[in-house]
Amino acid sequence: RGTVRSVAKAMELLQLLSERGEPLSLTEIARMQELPKSTAFGLLNTLREYEMVSQGRDGRYSLGIRLFEYGCRVSRAWDVPRLARPYLEQLAAQVNVSAVLSIREGDRVMTLDQVEGHGSLRVVSEVGGRLPLHCTSQGKVFLAALAESEAQALLGRRPLTAYTPHTVTDAAQLLASLEQVRRQGYAVEDGEYK
């Protein structure tokens, strides 16, 4: 596939630390990534040298300051959230609910920005966070915008995870519900994700 295994493993370690959101020990990281401790240590040590990972006094690892620096640079260089912000504010004020700017990345949705509405209905979406397509309003909007064959292929890649008892995990049922999203021009998530 043209990838370098050690770089891929290092990226997976960063992903783990990002998703967990709390410092992890070498033993925890090695176990979660199914790596020998010596391999995990070597990867973490290299990432620490480049300040992509930091190690606390207790020996636990977390994301490093260099990633924050890179994130700030990307944020400054990418105008989409800044340009969209006035429209999000206007929309949130008009409809009295939260307005969210998202992009689709494969089978996930990433939140770029959000503006809280003043009504009782609120969207809780972490900027920079990734959400599943099949059980979030943003994800359903993206799915509805695709050709049906493309949406079907995307949903058929892996089983649809049930996050709550209300999550639709049957691809055919979800595809049928997308017709309503197309007709009304918006999607609703009603206890399907959280």
Please provide the spans of the model-predicted regions.
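Intrinsically disordered, low-complexity polar/acidic regions
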Residues: 163-164
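Amphipathic alpha-helical effector-binding/dimerization core
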Residues: 62-158
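N-terminal helix-turn-helix
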Residues: 1-82
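Extended hydrophobic
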Residues: 170-194
